[in-house]
Amino acid sequence: ASNLATGGAGPLIXKGTGGRSS
């Protein structure tokens, strides 16, 4: 499950498709 691909929660990543705080 790529949280960046799904734009999921990634506060540590930060990156991704608008995935900041799900």
Curated annotation (Swiss-Prot):
Cofactor needs: FAD
Annotated GO CC locations: mitochondrial matrix
Major localization class: mitochondrion
Cofactor note: Binds 1 FAD per subunit.
Record keywords, A-Z: Electron transport, FAD, Flavoprotein, Mitochondrion, Respiratory chain, Transport
Location relative to the cell: Mitochondrion matrix
Domain of life: Eukaryota
Disordered: region residues: 1-22
Role, per record: Accessory subunit of the mitochondrial membrane respiratory chain NADH dehydrogenase (Complex I), that is believed not to be involved in catalysis. Complex I functions in the transfer of electrons from NADH to the respiratory chain. The immediate electron acceptor for the enzyme is believed to be ubiquinone.
Family to which the UniProt record says this protein belongs: Belongs to the complex I NDUFA9 subunit family.
Subunit relationships: Complex I is composed of about 45 different subunits.
Protein name: NADH dehydrogenase [ubiquinone] 1 alpha subcomplex subunit 9
Species: Solanum tuberosum
Top-level taxonomy: Eukaryota, Viridiplantae, Streptophyta, Embryophyta, Tracheophyta
